[in-house]
Amino acid sequence: MAKYINPAKVVTGVCRFSYANLWEAKAMDENSKPKYSVSLIIPKSDTKTIEKIRAAIQAAYEEGQGKLKGNSKSVPALTSIKTPLRDGDLERPDDEAYANSYFVNANSITAPGIVDAACQPILEHSEIYSGVYGRASITFYAFNTKTSRGIACGLQNVQKIWDGEPLGGHSRAEDDFATAEDEDFLN
């Protein structure tokens, strides 16, 4: 039997994680459900991932036309609704982390699977933080609420590939205290 391939699912290339809320679900406000979330910063040079995301958004649009139409007489054009692929140079011009990159905000009410480069589960919370580099499996789907409609991005799983400089101006304790000079204080 052939394996079903979801055209609205993407496994990204290596990207940078920002606003990484992957261990504990957080609510945006008191009226919303707590969600796990991450902003995936994708270099514009990763054209393969960008094209896969655009194709998945198109697939989600085609699959979700009934939902997008709602009570209207017609389905809105894809260009007229909210889509999750955003240009960091345009939307975050003052944030160096988003320079020359696109970004996608992905979230889920269920916890994502979190693994390392060897696909082994990561249990130590300090291993995943805003600034780390990794890959993510994400799915795109149509939504239609009272206030807006469009295509959203669901978070499935993340894979840490390598460490990066923490975003947000906070260093990691492991980095602050890992100098050889400090290791000699017991001698």
What are these regions (language model features)?
Residues 145-165:
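OB-fold/S1-family single-stranded nucleic acid-binding modules
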Residues 1-6, 165-187:
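Acidic, gly/ser/pro-rich intrinsically disordered tails
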Residues 115-134, 141-151:
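Exposed beta-sheet edge/beta-hairpin loop segments within beta-rich domains
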